[in-house]
Regions:
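Mature-chain termini and adjacent capping regions
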Residues: 1-251
Length: 251
């Protein structure tokens, strides 16, 4: 009887239309409520609209506290699309979101999270902890795009902060089983591992290092790049030699 009662509430909200402070939920195959465990299941073409977020998915498991509309955590699967009140947009095969902790875990072969000036893509997993300003991307191919850089690697870990409504990267650690790639307007940087510090305005490259600028290619074991003027130094630990290739071909 409770399931029917709650479902009637959902349908009545859909007819009346959502007002500020309300949560509107629509689903084609109804709702299954687990009152003791404080969660409910929504199946097939689920749409949840609230002041904080809009989410659509094939299946949603919603955890609540006081009542069904007091949603604290969501676990969603199948064609997930999520938009927050801050303008963040997430797409994935599975997406878990905690309203209490502002923690999002996005899974899928084409997982995507768009934070306006920060765009994250992965073929496996993206994590955002918005309360602490931390993020993680894990997969065979993970990609982070900012206003000034494009970063590709298997593992991308970092932190960010919001300054004047813009998310700025503070720190980055990029690793890859193959080669990481960092691209700016004037430089292409390759290595097995890369570390970025906004405080020091430095990018460090470790192992299998290659730095390309215009027709110049420098190869070594370690590089240190100043992000303000993009000057750099490349060194070699083992061979004590740095290889420089210059293409002087006239166009």
């Amino acid at each position: 009887m409770k399931k029917i009662f709650f479902l009637i509430i959902f349908l009545s909200f859909s007819v009346i239309g959502r007002e500020q402070g309300q949560t509107e939920i629509t689903t084609e195959e109804g709702i299954e409520v687990f009152q003791k465990e404080k969660y409910y299941l929504l199946k097939k073409n689920v749409l949840i609209e609230s002041d904080e977020f809009i989410l659509s998915a094939d299946l949603v498991k919603a955890f609540f506290e006081k009542d069904l509309y007091d949603i604290q955590k969501i676990e969603s699967e199948g064609n997930v699309n999520f938009t927050s009140s801050k303008g963040y947009n997430g797409v994935g095969e599975r997406l878990d979101f905690s309203m209490k902790n502002n923690l999002m875990n996005n899974f899928g072969n084409n997982a995507l999270l768009n934070m306006e000036n920060l765009i994250m893509k992965s073929d496996n997993y993206i994590m955002i902890d918005d309360s602490k300003g931390k993020f993680k991307l894990e997969g065979n191919i993970s990609e982070l795009t900012t206003d000034t850089m494009n970063i590709i690697g298997s593992s991308i870990n970092g932190s960010y902060e919001e300054i004047n409504d813009i998310n700025e990267i503070n720190n980055l650690i990029v690793k890859s089983d193959k080669i990481t790639e960092i691209t700016t307007d004037t430089l292409k940087m390759f290595s097995s591992k890369a570390v970025y510090s906004k405080k020091d305005n430095i990018i460090e490259l470790f192992d299998n290092v290659k730095v390309i600028r215009n027709n110049e290619i420098i190869i070594g074991d370690y590089a240190r790049i100043n992000t303000l003027n993009e000057s750099y130094k490349v060194s070699s630990n083992e061979s004590k030699k740095v290889k420089v290739l210059i293409d002087s071909t006239d166009e």
